[in-house]
Amino acid sequence: MTVIVPAYNEAASVADTIRSLQAQTERPFEITVVDDCSTDGTGDVARALGVTVVRPPHNTGSKAGAQSFGLRRVRTLLTVAIDADTVLAPDALERLLPAFERPEVAAACGFVLPQRVRSVWERGRYIEYLFAFTFYKQLQEYYGKPLISSGCFSMYRTAILREQGGWSDRTMAEDMDLTWSLYQGGHAVRFVPEAVCYPIEPRTFTLMATQLRRWSHGFVQNVRLHWRGLLTVPYLRSAVAVAFWDATIAAAVYLVVLPLLAVLLARPWILLGYVIDAPAVLVPVLAGAARRREIRRALASVPAFFVLRTVNALFFLRAVCAEFVLGRSLHVYEKGH
């Protein structure tokens, strides 16, 4: 297998990513860092660790562009894409490999957890990931349709990846775009929870806002791009519909209904609606945390999750209004860390 590491000004983190790849129980044939015209010496850091470094003639403008540039060099049957701020559990690559014993499988992804859990935003994301990957992703895998093969770490069958033209930059969520395109092409995607990766998550509100803006617009753009094709894919259409509807209703409830009712009816207790589903969230979260012996960390991080969830709702509602109502699509790719 060949690993592609797209990197733009990632000198502070790319070494950890490379070392985690070099320490894998299943060593990759080649590690290729795509230095996307960085200005901080990212390429030099990578070269010092003995990996292949390629640099496009000009900045590609997106992670999708950098990954597709790296794909040109791949000569192996499998291709791994990993962010330059992400480290892997020592057996992550080995854990993903069995998924490709089935010829219909085109992609496989693993369990994602934040590398650092310190700030309120990192803590909120920690609970968000524990909940999503312990509950939603497992359910999607049961029906054979994981909603997305995570962009921070996924493995692909190279021939099929090339058939898709690599990663497209037509949306802000190239990983979601590729996953849904694979389904519509009759291919399968697998979720392997034993393959764990640890990306660096936004530590400040400014960084989180940048990431949420990109993610929210990316989801809406993909719904608009793929909605006809989604209708032909059983289970995926339901998963997307539920996710879109849930996010829309949640945005309306958190940002309008609850505060309005609390003020108009003079009933402050109505604001408890923000955490009314706490038991449903806590069960899978604590189950996932228990398996990792992180119960105390999880309990301490739960309040941050409800803060982040409300902020998520705000950015999703803004994206829906911008993309569907105002016709202001997001085209500039900005990193979120």
Residue ranges of predicted features:
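Short, acidic, metal-binding catalytic loop of nucleotide-sugar glycosyltransferases
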Residues: 19-28
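N-proximal low-complexity "stem/linker" segments adjacent to membrane-targeting elements
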Residues: 1-19
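Long helical/loop segments within the catalytic core of UDP-sugar-dependent glycosyltransferases
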Residues: 55, 59-72, 76-77, 90-169, ...
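Membrane-embedded multi-pass helical conduit in multi-pass membrane proteins
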Residues: 246-326
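Short beta-strand/loop segment that forms part of the nucleotide-sugar
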Residues: 29-37, 54-56
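Acidic helix N-cap motif at the loop->helix transition within catalytic regions
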Residues: 15-16, 40-47, 91
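Cell-envelope/extracellular polymer assembly enzymes that use nucleotide-activated donors
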Residues: 1-2, 30, 177
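The conserved acidic donor/metal-binding loop of glycosyltransferases
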Residues: 83-87, 170
